[in-house]
Regions:
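Enzyme catalytic cores with a strong preference for nitrogen-chemistry domains
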Residues: 1-204
């Protein structure tokens, strides 16, 4: 992240309230590196919030570590404000289908080696981020599924979608993914703020 505007002037960052980074923007576990978060927070414009895709992990009661693909919001001092854990994981990319069955028949090493992310709550809780209406978070291809991207009973005011489209390569994939996002915005009647890594970023 640059501490100056595109024309090289630092004061051009004045008035920026939210900085949004895509999925896979941080190559480390931010909650385990408070010094890095503090340094990033110091670069943010005063009073602004960083919203970013990031990974986190936690220990279960049994001592097992579980990893999550998450959307996080951080304040100006690097403090965590809000977290959403991806609920709709990518088969074989983020989890191994039937992993409990494979584990039960003695293939634990296979199940642990492929797709290590845990599933976030399907209730899709809203994020409370200063300066924004209640936000529904969507990570990557979660935005593709009509009728299931938000809980309408919770009445979000906007959707933030972070994605890493780098694995599509030089194909039509990033454009198709973006057009599907536009359709979701129309279906839900909500603005979508989209930050993409090697894809199309936009406010829809």
């Amino acid at each position: 992240m640059s501490a100056v505007g595109p024309d090289g002037k630092k004061d051009n960052l004045a008035g920026i309230t939210h900085v949004i980074w895509p999925e896979a923007a941080m190559p480390f576990l931010p909650l385990e590196h408070p010094d890095a978060l503090a340094a990033i927070g110091a670069m943010l414009p005063d009073g602004s919030v960083l919203v970013t895709g990031a990974l986190r992990r936690e220990k279960t009661a049994g001592g097992e570590r579980r990893g999550f693909n998450s959307l996080m919001a951080f304040g100006g001092k690097g403090q965590l404000i809000a977290t959403y854990d991806k609920a709709h994981l990518v088969p074989f990319g983020e989890y191994l289908p039937f992993n409990t069955v494979l584990g039960a028949i003695g293939l634990e090493k296979l199940t642990k080696g492929l797709g290590s992310f845990a599933t976030g709550p399907m209730s899709r809780p809203l994020l409370t981020i200063p300066g924004l209406p209640p936000v529904a978070g969507l990570i990557c291809y979660e935005v593709l599924f009509p009728g299931s991207v938000i809980d309408r009973k919770l009445k979000p005011g906007a959707i933030i979608n972070v994605t890493n489209d780098g694995w599509f390569g030089d194909t039509t994939g990033p454009r198709q993914h973006f057009h599907q996002t536009r359709v979701r915005a129309v279906e839900e009647g909500l603005p979508i703020i989209r930050a993409a890594n090697n894809g199309i970023s936009a406010v829809i």
